[in-house]
Amino acid sequence: MSDNAQLTGLCDRFRGFYPVVIDVETAGFNAKTDALLEIAAITLKMDEQGWLMPDTTLHFHVEPFVGANLQPEALAFNGIDPNDPDRGAVSEYEALHEIFKVVRKGIKASGCNRAIMVAHNANFDHSFMMAAAERASLKRNPFHPFATFDTAALAGLALGQTVLSKACQTAGMDFDSTQAHSALYDTERTAVLFCEIVNRWKRLGGWPLSAAEEV
């Protein structure tokens, strides 16, 4: 059997990338002008047999940056009151500094080289996180500047569904629509969905690659 067929480590599975599941809730669609209000992150790990699973969860309510737009339609959609003192919101710097610190530790521990965002319709979440990191002057951003794993695309391929709730249900997972549009809940569901898609491909024999497929 080839050496490649024995690879079960996280660093081997994604070409040295360390996948981190992210979801954000915002006050609009423009990452440069609209507020980031909530962010959750879940790191992933692999067991000794190469099965992917969620690992560490981080979750923060975020204070709107100075001068941020707060679109009423977006707030009505996600139900967030940015002025609610019970949110326990922190600055963009505090939230991302803690997430990046945990992610960098995970990269080192797993032998990976760089983090890659996993998200549902990932361009949206990626743009908001990157804009917030720039505003916060966080220089050591561990995430790839543009590459992502988009579970909307992956679920469309693997399950024939692109909506998060429908993809989860098709995969045999629970999805509580009353908890949707919470960054924490959506991140948890996205993490389990991504793991299921990756593990399903393994169960079907798609990974590890056969000797004939090795480059």
UniProtKB/Swiss-Prot annotation:
Hydrolase as a keyword of this entry, yes or no, is yes
A GO biological process this protein is involved in? DNA damage response
Q: How is the cofactor bound?
A: Binds two Mg(2+) per subunit. The active form of the enzyme binds two Mg(2+) ions in its active site. The first Mg(2+) forms only one salt bridge with the protein.
Q: Which domain of life is it from?
A: Bacteria
Xref: InterPro entries = Exonuclease_RNaseT/DNA_pol3, RNase_T, RNaseH-like_sf, RNaseH_sf
What does the record note on quaternary structure?
Homodimer.
Name by which UniProt lists this protein: Ribonuclease T
Species this protein is from = Escherichia coli (strain K12)
Q: Which gene encodes it?
A: rnt
